[in-house]
Design a protein with these regions (language model features):
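Axial heme c-ligation environment in periplasmic c-type cytochrome domains
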Residues: 23-25, 84-93, 108-126
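Flexible gly/pro/ser-rich segments immediately N-terminal to CXXCH heme-c attachment motifs
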Residues: 64-68, 95-98, 121-125
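Gly/Gly-Pro-rich "capping" loops immediately C-terminal to redox-active cysteine motifs
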Residues: 50-52, 74-110
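The canonical Cys-X-X-Cys-His
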Residues: 59, 68-79
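Bacterial N-terminal signal peptides that target proteins for export
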Residues: 1-9
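Extracytoplasmic/secreted proteins, especially bacterial periplasmic and envelope-associated proteins
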Residues: 54, 58-61, 100-104, 120
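Electrostatic cytochrome c docking/interface patches
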Residues: 27-65
Length: 126
């Protein structure tokens, strides 16, 4: 099974949200997130990844910057999902985070989020 780093990071971010961009919290919108554009609409996590300990462990290493020092989600979002940088989304807000589909995770991690500090990561994750 080919594991793409982007998929693992998206999975790790989402898994962290279910289980549970300095200092101040980002304002949270109350409506549902926008749908992913067409080029991301068919992006989904492979079957079985949500329960695969090896995949989750690799995702954790990517999320925390262990596998690649140029990619460290936790530097903004915190190791436990609590933001450590201004403007970072609080991943501990499970009800909000459950609204994000796999395709939205792929899109936002790949392309970043306009008008925020969340940059595009697709050049660092494949």
């Amino acid at each position: 099974m080919k594991i793409t780093r982007l998929a693992v990071v998206a999975l790790m971010g989402f898994a962290g949200l279910l289980l549970s961009g300095c200092g101040e919290e980002a304002p949270e919108s109350t409506g549902p997130p926008p749908p992913a554009p067409a080029e991301y609409a068919d992006k989904h996590m492979p079957a079985g990844w949500w329960a695969d300990e090896k995949i989750l462990a690799e995702g954790k290493e990517i999320f925390e910057g262990v596998k690649n020092i140029d990619v460290n989600c936790a530097s903004c979002h915190g190791k436990d999902g609590k933001p450590v940088k201004a403007g970072a989304r609080d991943f501990r807000k499970g009800e909000r985070m459950k609204q994000y589909s796999d395709s939205v995770w792929f899109w936002r991690i790949s392309e970043g989020v306009p008008n925020t500090k969340m940059k595009a990561w697709k050049s660092k994750l494949s």
